[in-house]
Amino acid sequence: MRTQYCGQVTAAHLDQIVTLCGWVHRRRDHGGVIFIDLRDREGLVQVVCDPDRAEMFKTAESVRNEFVLKMTGKVRRRPAGTENANLTSGEIEVLCHEIEVLNTSATPPFQLDDENLSETVRLTNRVIDLRRPQMQKNLMLRYKVAMAFRRFLDGAGFIDVETPMLTKSTPEGARDYLVPSRVHPGQFFALPQSPQLFKQLLMVAGFDRYYQITKCFRDEDLRADRQPEFTQVDIETSFLNETEITALMEEMIRFVFKESLGVDLPSPFPRMTYAEAMRRYGSDKPDLRVTLELTEVTDLMKDVAFKVFSGPANSGGRVAAMRVPGGATLTRGEIDEYTKFVGIYGAKGLAYIKVNDASQPNETGLQSPIVKNLSEAALRGVIERTGAQSGDLIFFGADKAKVVNDAIGALRIKLGHEKGYVTGDAWRPLWVVDFPMFEYDEDDKRWTACHHPFTSPKDEHVELLKTNPGECLAKAYDLALNGWEIGGGSVRIHRADVQATVFEALNIGAEEQQVKFGFLLDALKFGAPPHGGLAFGLDRVVTMMAGAESIRDVIAFPKTQRAQCLLTNAPGEVDEKQLRELHIRLRQKVETQVEVGKA
């Protein structure tokens, strides 16, 4: 039906007859000559319809935007001065000989080049939205990235094995999506939050190197970088230690970026412990492009009169300072806006000191309402530790450690990018290692797994599982890139006794272990090899590469932040017959919620 894609016609085809198929992107009538920009997934080409061919010209007069056309014509150079350097086909145009309307189109709900559309409008009309050149580029990039992952893993001896989509509900952190069983009344499958247990079982079965690009499902509150269903590049390997696994995965990520974007990432990626990342950046996925850092000053504030600082300092909280070079020029209005911003993260305020004269750490050299309530020794310590100079500003966070880390860590990113405290590097990868095994849930008064309960503790910390779980570090590693976690994994527990001990630390008793994880514990008894792995979020990786604002811009048919599909109106009601077959009865009629406003 066609000889070329529209976007692939170039000067190499001069004087050739080509047949093209595509959509009318734009039609223009200039002095009796009609110009049609014909579009397909590869791009645009300008087609010229001359009135000398009467029948063809009459058809051209009738076409409108988004009509589907088949056009045959001769490739020629554009007149001098009319070239378009933004198009691959910008040096040439096609003089139309024949035109056939393959299909007409209703008036589209919006122009494809309209950049002020709400996300609700875009997602409701997703099919039209996907015709926009940027969306076409995003999904083509997604394909290239996925294929690059596959090429590397295939070449490294990994095999692609599918794992079940209907699985058993197990506690992995987020809520499961449950699927009722028709043939087993009152029982439910769960859609997998990850293939975690199955890929471990494949290692026990001796497959050595596994990968899968697969869908995962988590019924959790959504953010800009989250979806209820997301795509994961899932990887597991046997007989490699933590260092060997991260080295192999680092090689893979460099390969994927080079193949997909032509970008050379640094080698090797730097490594940083979780404790250092939280201390210096307030985040376990720090954006290293931002040069601002947090400085620990908790010990300096224990004896000061300022209760906002001394309170947290003496009750297990944190007081952190962040030096902003040249920041004394910030206006009161700007500081007020930053104060409102940190409030989003639970901070009760944002203390600051303007450093007018760093040589005088007192009310003479420092400007702030809090200076009079801080000792000169504390102020001198702050100036020395932060390295503050005259003309700088120092922000403070004082609260529970989590609030300080979240609030000042977020302020660091916002201020850094807004005011130019950045390195200028395009990509700054970082391995974050030595995560805690557990964190304490104050509400439930119990330990929970920081990653998941199948992560191996460091060899020297196995004994701490029973005596002091809070001090136990894990053989876990995350790959952060520009402030995003793009991948995470760990060495797994391969001994049944250690796995049972971890379950006990999580308050999962022997009976519950057998009910929920008996199949895993049994498998580990039959010569399970040392194994570990990692999973990369394909949606996040592509979002970063594409420079998109949301992962919804790199997924063909995404859900909204209320976990709805505006195109198909899913989820939806089902009829009583289907419910009866599933042995389900609704306790009360549920009001149908209609998505409005922000998507």
Swiss-Prot record:
InterPro entries, per database record: Aa-tRNA-synt_II (IPR004364), aa-tRNA-synth_II (IPR006195), aa-tRNA-synth_II/BPL/LPL (IPR045864), Asp-tRNA-ligase_1 (IPR004524), Asp-tRNA-ligase_1_N (IPR047089), Asp/Asn-tRNA-synth_IIb (IPR002312), AspRS_core (IPR047090), GAD-like_sf (IPR004115)
Main location: cytoplasm
Protein localization: Cytoplasm
Record-listed L-aspartate binding positions: E172, R218, H451, R492
Residues given in the record as ATP binding sites: R218, D219, E220, Q227, E485, G537, L538, D539, R540
PROSITE patterns in the cross-refs: AA_TRNA_LIGASE_II
Biological processes per GO annotation: aspartyl-tRNA aminoacylation
CDD domains per UniProt: AspRS_core, EcAspRS_like_N
Stored Gene3D superfamilies: Bira Bifunctional Protein, Domain 2, GAD-like domain, Nucleic acid-binding proteins
Aspartate as annotated region, ranges: 196-199
Site (Important for tRNA non-discrimination): H30, G81
Reaction equations catalysed: tRNA(Asx) + L-aspartate + ATP = L-aspartyl-tRNA(Asx) + AMP + diphosphate
One of the Pfam families matching this protein, by short name: tRNA-synt_2
GO cellular component terms, semicolon-separated: cytoplasm
Top-rank lineage group of the source organism: Bacteria
SUPFAM superfamilies (alphabetical): Class II aaRS and biotin synthetases, GAD domain-like, Nucleic acid-binding proteins
EC number(s) on file: 6.1.1.23
Known function: Aspartyl-tRNA synthetase with relaxed tRNA specificity since it is able to aspartylate not only its cognate tRNA(Asp) but also tRNA(Asn). Reaction proceeds in two steps: L-aspartate is first activated by ATP to form Asp-AMP and then transferred to the acceptor end of tRNA(Asp/Asn).
Assembly notes: Homodimer.
Record HAMAP family: Asp_tRNA_synth_type1
Record-linked PANTHER family: ASPARTATE--TRNA LIGASE, MITOCHONDRIAL, ASPARTYL/LYSYL-TRNA SYNTHETASE
Name of the protein in question: Aspartate--tRNA(Asp/Asn) ligase
Species name: Azoarcus sp. (strain BH72)
GN (gene name): aspS
